[in-house]
């Protein structure tokens, strides 16, 4: 089984997190690919996908990443990803932009669901105390929602700006979860 690893970035931080993921998965995960240098045609060729997206403070209701993902979102539902496991991670700043923490991750989630993907890798809110609201909280996706007990993020939130010291451990724990959920 080979998992595709894709990311969009403006600062390089999303690519750095891909490096941590690759360390955890080894050869089960392909080398990370920047979506600005590749089209989506290869997505269905993988047994599953892990995709990373930053949330950039664009002030927009849509196209929140400020990366190549924004131009590719509407093409995702045209892919045949029925039943393929897809996990997402998003970068954001829970202190500086705590009112829209990792919002762009919700956009990817929505479009991959439309393609029939089996979404995996949901993460508990435990340990994420700094943010005030997010659009990527389950069960209220795409609504600006304040965190409540029992909710989950629709992927792994990563805060390299305010909680960078927690990133590697969060990624390691998430990858352990993904290996089970993806059958690796």
Give, region by region, the residue ranges found by the protein language model.
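A short beta-strand-loop structural module common to alpha/beta enzyme folds
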Residues: 28-39
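N-terminal beta1-alpha1 ligand-phosphate binding loop
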Residues: 2-24
